[in-house]
Amino acid sequence: MNENAGRSLAPQASEGLGTPRDYISLLKPRVMSLVIFTALVGLVRAPDHVHPVIAFTAILCIAVGAGAAGALNMWWDADIDAVMSRTQRRPIPAGRVTPREALAFGLTLAAFSVVVLGLLVNVLAGALLAFTIFFYVVVYTMWLKRSTPQNIVIGGLSGALPPMVAWAAASGSISLESVILVAIIFFWTPPHFWALSLYRADDYARAGVPMLPVTAGPDETRKQILLYTLFLVPLALSPVMLGEAGLAYGVVAGVTGLGMLLLAVNVYRRRTGPAAVTAAKKLFGFSILYLFLLFATLLAEALVRGM
């Protein structure tokens, strides 16, 4: 453990005694909702029929595992969260939950989610969930986040894996389509978070987090956003080309992909002043809608096909 973690375990301003709402906040509900949604798509699109109880158990365990990873991330990053304006009110830096309480909470949920998924669903799904939690907490949070501007690129794998975990829960195997679902989220992550970091660069710099705009500058970040978007858009169309998705998905992926590309070009061109901030915010917001529409269409096609 590094010195930052040592500080994060120091006595806090209060004795903890957090409310249920504080512990829910530790789970990062917004992130958890995305994990649940993308995992549900993986579960429904898997070729095997899944008993409703098994399906519910799988989604529950994946959600709890994601929440556990979020809690452990907040435990480790308490010193960073105390410095950054957008995270200062989180339960640990605000003193409502102590670091030790958050650590115990996160470890308990992580163990529960992996063991239950492995025993009640299948070992492959449990192993993939364990790897996902490990990658997010140890590889990304404890190592990459503070050491390299590629933190989001490499660390993004953990956020991309839930559809594969759910696919494995449903089928007991991994297929090409599950890999494509992971790849779409993986290559979506850098443009999404770099757009955010363009207008939050001062916050990251103050906390000592080497996000790309801090280390390489905003112009290089804009170029990387455009390059990743140029790769992401055709990748998102690949399920149609491979016969895994239908016309509806192709139309949605094509139209929204064009929107992503135009907004990325706008970010690349708008380099100074309020226009640059507005362009980055628009891309950040639209990227969320983009991913949602892609996966919602895949989900809808699978449900219609199963009728």
UniProtKB/Swiss-Prot annotation:
Keywords: Cell inner membrane, Cell membrane, Heme biosynthesis, Membrane, Transferase, Transmembrane, Transmembrane helix. It is found in: Cell inner membrane. Signal peptide: none annotated. GO terms for cellular component: plasma membrane. It catalyses: heme b + (2E,6E)-farnesyl diphosphate + H2O = Fe(II)-heme o + diphosphate. Pathway: Porphyrin-containing compound metabolism; heme O biosynthesis; heme O from protoheme: step 1/1. One of its GO terms (biological process) is heme O biosynthetic process. The chain crosses the membrane at residues 24-44, 52-72, 115-135, 152-172, 179-199, 224-244, 245-265, 284-304. Coiled coil: none annotated. It is a multi-pass membrane protein. One of its GO terms (molecular function) is protoheme IX farnesyltransferase activity. It is an enzyme of class 2 (transferase). It holds the Pfam family UbiA. PANTHER family: 4-HYDROXYBENZOATE SOLANESYLTRANSFERASE, PROTOHEME IX FARNESYLTRANSFERASE, MITOCHONDRIAL. Carbon 2 of the heme B porphyrin ring is defined according to the Fischer nomenclature. Belongs to the UbiA prenyltransferase family. Protoheme IX farnesyltransferase subfamily. This is Protoheme IX farnesyltransferase. It comes from Azorhizobium caulinodans (strain ATCC 43989 / DSM 5975 / JCM 20966 / LMG 6465 / NBRC 14845 / NCIMB 13405 / ORS 571). The gene is ctaB.
